[in-house]
């Protein structure tokens, strides 16, 4: 659910991002990059779980059968999403609404996780939250019952053919004007005393803005940390400088790190095809992978006028930007080191899996860039590529040959290119 405050946060953030595009101005038609983009095939970083989005039939209606194929299939004119997020309704009579799309995602090899907005009504009480006397929180004597409620959802989905990969304890506990608030200490108590009884991987705490004061207490408490499997967060208005999380690197060994909800750069009506604004989506994913070390990137509504799939079921420009990652960087692939910024406004990330190297290169400049890619600690022979620009959507380019472990490629102005290198 969107609010004007959250939308304002995102608009302010994107103003800074888009200024770089606006200020580049006209110039020569192409340049050669100042530096090589070096890809070190043996320098492993994080394992990638996947890319995807949210289905919320209770609020905006279910995906149709055809839209499920577009979302989770990986053929032509399909997004290749490998992660689905679903809603844990406070009313169990509505749980059936989540089944069909989740089963379709599973059939296509995607993983499914679930997030609750509210506990059942009989577990909730109102309190005064900064003057709001109708604010909601989980009653302190209902923590165990709430854990069982989450278990019941896990079991319901399993009995209907969906084995959840994970379940969250709460969506945005720190931005709960329209759902249930949790303080950091309340989250800590639940994670320490109750989360261990949940029969699925547990995601916490899903802060709306990656506010570390929400998750630090979990990382600093051995029992709570033991009960958390995935640290999940949202990135609404989060500056890239806040993407790294040193405490997680220090104490989160064996845990996963997911970005579980965002829309970017805004949620304006009918904005999904704006160009070059949509190029910001691939840049945002790049920073999430490279600066944030996230293992999953999950959009808000899959089908929306500002989302990866428009209301008519067609893939949007924003969706094609996501597809440059989701279709090629498959679950279990590993991000590897690459020169992340070989030229101003050029961003490069690289991944390996299935005996391939996948390189995603984003050129935000108003001019084309000729970029040299150097493959280190591995051999390759041929490169396929796909390009999205103002005039193309995942358009296949001519294959390139690798000579002495490097290849040159033209990155069109304001474009994203995915290279698949055969090893």
Curated annotation (Swiss-Prot):
Coiled coil: none annotated. The keyword Plastid does not apply. Catalyzes the depolymerization of methylglucuronoxylan (MeGAXn). It cleaves the beta-1,4-xylosidic bond penultimate to that linking carbon one of the xylose residue substituted with alpha-1,2-linked 4-O-methyl-D-glucuronate (MeGA). Its EC number is 3.2.1.136. It catalyses: Endohydrolysis of (1->4)-beta-D-xylosyl links in some glucuronoarabinoxylans. Residues 1-33 form the signal peptide. It is an enzyme of class 3 (hydrolase). InterPro entries: Glyco_hydro_30, Glyco_hydro_b, Glycoside_hydrolase_SF. This is Glucuronoxylanase XynC. The lineage of its organism: Bacteria, Bacillati, Bacillota, Bacilli, Bacillales. GO terms for molecular function: glucosylceramidase activity; glucuronoarabinoxylan endo-1,4-beta-xylanase activity. Pathway: Glycan degradation; xylan degradation. One of its GO terms (biological process) is sphingolipid metabolic process. The active site is at residues 172, 261. It is found in: Secreted. Belongs to the glycosyl hydrolase 30 family. One of its GO terms (cellular component) is membrane. It comes from Bacillus subtilis. The keyword Hydrolase applies. Keywords: Carbohydrate metabolism, Glycosidase, Hydrolase, Polysaccharide degradation, Secreted, Signal, Xylan degradation.
């Amino acid at each position: 659910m969107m609010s004007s405050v959250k939308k304002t946060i995102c608009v302010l953030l994107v103003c800074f991002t888009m200024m770089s595009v606006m200020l580049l101005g006209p110039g020569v038609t192409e340049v050669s990059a100042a530096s090589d983009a070096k890809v070190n095939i043996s320098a492993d970083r994080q394992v990638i779980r996947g890319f995807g989005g949210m289905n919320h039939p209770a609020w905006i209606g279910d995906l149709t059968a055809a839209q499920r194929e577009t979302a989770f299939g990986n053929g032509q004119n399909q997004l290749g999403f490998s992660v689905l997020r679903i809603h844990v309704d406070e009313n169990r009579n509505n749980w059936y609404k989540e089944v069909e799309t989740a089963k379709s995602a599973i059939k296509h090899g995607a993983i499914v996780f679930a997030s609750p907005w509210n506990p059942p009504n009989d577990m909730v009480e109102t309190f005064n939250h900064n003057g709001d006397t109708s604010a909601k929180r989980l009653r302190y004597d209902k923590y165990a019952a709430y854990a069982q409620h989450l278990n019941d959802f896990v079991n319901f989905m399993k009995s209907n053919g969906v084995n959840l990969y994970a379940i969250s304890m709460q969506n945005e506990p720190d931005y709960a004007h329209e759902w249930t608030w949790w303080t950091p200490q309340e989250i800590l108590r639940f994670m320490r005393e109750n989360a261990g009884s949940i029969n699925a991987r547990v995601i916490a705490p899903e802060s709306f803005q990656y506010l570390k004061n929400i998750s630090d207490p979990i990382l600093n408490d051995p029992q709570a940390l033991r009960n958390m499997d995935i640290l999940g967060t949202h990135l609404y208005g989060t500056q890239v400088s806040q993407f790294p999380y040193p405490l997680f690197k220090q104490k989160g060994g064996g845990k996963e790190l997911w970005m579980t909800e965002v829309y970017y750069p805004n949620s304006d009506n009918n904005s999904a095809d704006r160009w070059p604004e949509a190029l910001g989506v691939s840049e945002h994913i790049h920073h999430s992978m490279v600066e944030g070390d996230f293992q999953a990137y999950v959009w808000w509504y899959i089908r929306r006028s500002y989302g990866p799939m428009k209301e008519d079921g067609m893939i949007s420009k924003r969706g094609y930007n996501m597809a440059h990652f989701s279709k090629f960087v498959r679950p279990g692939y590993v991000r590897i080191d690459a020169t992340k910024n070989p030229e101003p406004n050029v961003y490069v990330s690289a991944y390996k899996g299935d005996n391939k190297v996948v390189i995603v290169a984003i050129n935000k400049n108003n001019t084309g860039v000729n970029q040299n890619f150097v493959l280190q600690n591995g051999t390759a022979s041929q490169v396929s590529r796909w390009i999205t620009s103002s005039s193309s959507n995942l358009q296949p380019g001519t294959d390139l040959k690798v000579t002495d472990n490097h290849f040159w490629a033209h990155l069109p102005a304001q474009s994203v290119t995915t290279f698949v290198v055969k090893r």
